[in-house]
A protein has these predicted regions:
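Small-residue-rich segments of transmembrane alpha-helices in multi-pass membrane proteins
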Residues: 40-51, 102-116, 170-183, 233-245
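The feature identifies polytopic integral membrane transport proteins across all domains of life
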Residues: 37-42, 63-75, 92-101, 133, ...
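Mid-bilayer segments of alpha-helical transmembrane spans in multi-pass integral membrane proteins
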Residues: 79-83, 104-117, 139-148
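Hydrophobic transmembrane alpha-helices of secondary-active transporters
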Residues: 8-30, 48-53, 73-81, 145-155, ...
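Generic transmembrane alpha-helix signature in multi-pass membrane proteins
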Residues: 53-57, 69-72, 80-93, 97-100, ...
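Conserved small/polar residues in nucleotide/adenosyl-binding loops
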Residues: 271-280
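Entry/N-cap segments of selected transmembrane alpha helices
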Residues: 27-57, 187-218, 256-266
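Juxtamembrane helix-boundary/capping and inter-helix hinge elements in multi-pass membrane proteins
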Residues: 26, 33-37, 61-65, 86-95, ...
Length: 281
């Protein structure tokens, strides 16, 4: 797991820098000006998703390592992939960007809280005394918050250049995502395969259940169909690289990363399928 531990923080920082390059203050002001859809989305993503994941791991009786790995991916905010697929689905891309941006900034507090609380509920007691909720939050701030802010500053002074090349930035972040998970598969293939069936089923069920649930909740409270599609996708497509980073910072066992690896396989496959369908149409 040594290679993954080294490249995950770098890849995550670059991905978050790419996210920041695509953001402006308008994306945050939109939350204030149109709070209803955002509130529905952020509640589904940050509160409902971890609850559903916890109920699922109890129903499936997952081993502790896989259970906590599932909670790590459920705690992660939406990733850049959700923005791309929202566009493919004719959803509200602006809302998707706002949810991803704000969710990513909140994640430095929410992710450590959810992961450490889940570990306590699941009876995980072998965490090192050197690993604390505050310590993980500070590390996340360095590789999540700082790059996002830096990206926004760069965009502020080179907006025309960044805007004309944002598709290249998105492609690079997509490649980084694939590189991280390719490294996991190459380095820990045998260990991952031994757990993959159980973890893959759990992740697939979580995605389907949560995206369906979020869609119908949004149907009752959000303003329209594009917003429902956006909220549904935001609740099913998390920042897998961030989940890997958190897992490698807290645990030494690859089993904790298997749900994230399974999630990445599903995400890449689904994204490729949607992109192919979009080109065909």
């Amino acid at each position: 797991m040594e290679i993954v531990t080294k490249i995950a923080p770098i890849a995550l920082a670059l991905i978050m820098l790419g996210l920041g390059l695509g953001l402006s203050t308008r994306d945050f002001l939109r939350v204030i000006n149109n709070p209803k859809d955002f509130t529905v989305g952020i509640i589904c993503q940050l509160i409902l998703l971890p609850i559903v994941a916890y109920i699922l791991l109890l129903i499936l009786r997952l081993p502790v390592e896989l259970a906590l790995g599932l909670m790590i991916i459920a705690a992660a905010p939406g990733g850049v992939t959700s923005n791309v697929l929202t566009k493919f689905a004719n959803g509200d891309v602006a809302l998707s960007i706002s949810l991803t941006a704000v969710g990513s900034l909140i994640s430095i507090f929410s992710v450590p809280f959810i992961v450490f609380s889940s570990a306590k509920l699941l009876g995980v007691t072998d965490l090192s005394s050197d690993i604390t909720m505050t310590g993980i939050a500070l590390k996340m701030a360095l590789v999540v918050t700082v790059p996002v802010i830096l990206g926004m500053i760069i965009r502020r002074f080179a907006e025309n250049f960044i805007s004309s090349n944002i598709n290249i930035v998105n492609r690079i972040t997509g490649i980084l995502f694939i590189v991280v998970f390719a490294a996991i598969w190459i380095e820990e293939r045998e260990n991952i395969i031994s757990y993959l069936g159980q973890a893959g089923l759990a992740v697939l069920i979580l995605n389907v259940v949560m995206m369906t649930l979020a869609f119908y909740i949004a149907k009752g409270f959000a303003t329209g169909i594009p917003q429902r599609k956006c909220i549904s996708l935001e609740c099913g497509l998390q920042n897998g690289t961030l989940a890997v980073f958190v897992a490698t910072q807290i645990f030494n066992d690859v089993a904790y990363m298997v749900p994230t690896a399974a999630y990445a396989l599903i995400t890449v496959s689904y994204t490729h399928l949607r992109a192919h369908e979009t080109k065909a149409n």
